[in-house]
Every structure is written in structure tokens, then in C-alpha cells.
């Protein structure tokens, strides 16, 4: 933890520098960042799981305590208004005593609706950052999530501090242990539900603590890109396993995917080919490279796999140009990663929020940035047998280029995705996922 504390000092200094710059530019007194409030289920007395505002998490690892506030201006010591009620019904969060507390002036809030007493006396020139605009209006904030401030913060959040990079390495390290446990469970006959339980046990995090709903897909379920239903019963025949699952550390996410074949067969060979292609794509990452160019290169590699495994005929570029590869690989190559799984800033050309749209032929690409040092991105090429997409190919001349017998052979396996989390450095790439032990 001493290593993390050392980096945290510089992290706070950088966040203060960013705030000082944007509040000066926008002639604001400062920013008031709200952790969030509980959301009550309709007609019930139970709240949905609480998720803290990522702008709040950027400053400190208070992840599970609603009704907290940060008051920052980039000059003075940041103020943390920490919610600490008198409550015999629920567990009250302990007053923090970790290494990061020395960087904050901490005030305790015992009643959520009394926060105005602890906020700046005149907040008319302070900007509110958070979800609850109705609360901000009642408190008197006239500037609520201003576009200029949000765009600036989102653009710069893509450049990670050393503290953030270390948190993300630890999030990867934790997730790797879960992936190894899940792989073992698959080969030992566990159901989707049982694999999920073993994964969560290995990472030591509950369903509401991991950064997103895990995808635990056996056989043809792997063709559903965001499959989150967990079947309790095993399929009649065990063929394949796709797991897309991460872990959290101090609010930062990992996002890792692997695909396994139960037996050595054609599908297993396809996994090997995809793994090779993914590593080649990662080798192409460097500062100055346009992420959309990597995505287009992925389609070229998918096209070659379609030819090599006799899924399609023709030439590789023709398969890309006709949209055939998009039927087999319909999603983007990856995305920014950080405080959020699909982190902000992936389309920002500059700190004013100038938008770089995804290519018209590839609307699901989540990042169009030029790569730069200290960015963290996922690299997740895939190849799937998705009938709703492949059926579109049957409606025109592209039908003649598809080897439907091979498609039928691979359909029960669902699909393949392989995903690593990569730091772009000035002179190299750091594949956290591989370097921390997941082949």
C-alpha cells in the first residue's frame, strides 16, 4: 500500500491541476462533486445497488457510501463531506482512516438533507457534477454538469496517472485469478451458474462489486454478445466456454475475455488463430496510431480467418468491403478502460469535446482516438455465428460466398472473443492481462 500511497500524492496533484485550469477558464469558483444517492425500487423499501459517481471515484476510493460530496477548486485542500448518519437499521460506513485521508479536509454529514450547512455559503458560482440534478437545483446550483467542464474532464481522464495504472494492474491481477478458477470449473463440468460462483469466490467480490455483469456462456450462448443469463443446468454436450468478466480495485475496472474449447477440434484451432491475431494487433498499438485503423486491421484478420477455415470464399479485402466480416465480427475492437468499463473520452478529439464519430460502416466502435501514452484500452477481436446477422447475407449475392456447411458445423460453439487490457507507453505496450498470468 505504501507504493500506492506514493503514487496517490501525485494523482491528487494532477486532479487539482486539472480543476484549477478548467475553473479558471470557465470563471467558476470550483466544483462540487456528488457521490450520488440511493435509488428506491418501485413500490418497495429496498434500494438498487449503489454505484458512485465516477467523477467522485476519481478522487478517492469511497465506493459504497451515498450522500457524500467533494468540494474542490484546485487551490485549496479538497473538502470531503462524508455521510455518517446515526442509523440502527443499516451498516454505517466507517469514518475513513486510509492513506488518502491526509489529502482531504473531512467533514461528517449526519443527515443527508442538511448538506447545505457544509457546502460553500455562496454556491451560485460553483458547478455541480453528479446525477441528481433535482437536488442540485434545490441547493441553488445554477451550473449543473456544464458541457465545457465535463468535456474537459472526460478528455483528460483517458490519460491515466501512475496511481490509476497501478490500481488497474491490481484489478487485472484479481480478475486473472477468477479466470483461472472459471477455466478449471468449466473443464470439471460446472454449469454456467456454478462457474459464476467459483469466479466470484476466487476474486473475492460479489455480483454488485465486480465492474459489470459477468458473461458466462457455454456453447451457443457464446453467440449472444451480452449474455448475462446463467443457466443452472448443464447442456447435454459440453462444447465451448466464453467468459467475459472483470474485477474492481479502488473503483478501477478490469475487463477480460477468454474462450475455450472442451475438446481439440476445428473450433479450438479457430481460437488459436484468433489468439495469434489478437496479439499481433496489440503489437501494432503505439502512440500516434488511430484506434479505428486497428479496428479495420482486425476486419482484415477476421477475413483471412474466414478464408483459412473455409467459412467464406473470395478475397480478404472483398469480404471486408461487402460487410461479410461485420456479420461475423459485429462489435468494435475495444474501448477505453478506467473508472468505468466503457470509460469516457473515447470519441473526444480535444478537451472541448469535439466528437470523432465512428466510421459509418462500423457504428459500434467505441473508440476513435489517436493513441497516446498512459491510455488504457481493451483489445477484444471476435468471431461469432449469429444467425440474425448471417441471415442478412442470405438475402443477396453474398449468400454464395458463405460456406453454410462450415457455419452449421461451428454454430453449436457460439463464438470466440479474446480480450486483454493494455497500457500504451511511449516506447512499448504493457499487456497487463498476459503479464499477470493469463495466457
From Swiss-Prot:
Give yes or no: UniProt keyword Metal-binding: yes
EC number per UniProt: 3.4.13.9
**GO MF annotations for this entry?**
aminopeptidase activity; metal ion binding; metalloexopeptidase activity; phosphoric triester hydrolase activity; proline dipeptidase activity
Q: Please give a single GO biological process term from the UniProt record.
A: proteolysis
What reaction gets catalysed by this protein? Xaa-L-Pro dipeptide + H2O = an L-alpha-amino acid + L-proline
**Family annotation (PROSITE patterns):** PROLINE_PEPTIDASE
Q: Which residues make up the binding site for Mn(2+) 1? A: 255, 335, 380, 419
Keywords on this record?
Dipeptidase, Hydrolase, Manganese, Metal-binding, Metalloprotease, Protease
Q: Which cysteines are joined by disulfide bonds?
A: none
Cofactor stoichiometry and binding? Binds 2 manganese ions per subunit.
* Annotated GO CC locations: cytosol
Necessary cofactors: Mn(2+)
SUPFAM superfamilies with a match to the protein in the record: Creatinase/aminopeptidase
Positions bound to Mn(2+) 2: 244, 255, 419
* Summary of the function given for this chain in its UniProt record: Splits dipeptides with a prolyl residue in the C-terminal position.
Which family is annotated? Belongs to the peptidase M24B family. Bacterial-type prolidase subfamily.
Q: What is this protein called?
A: Xaa-Pro dipeptidase
Q: Which organism is it from?
A: Shewanella sp. (strain MR-4)
* Annotated gene: pepQ
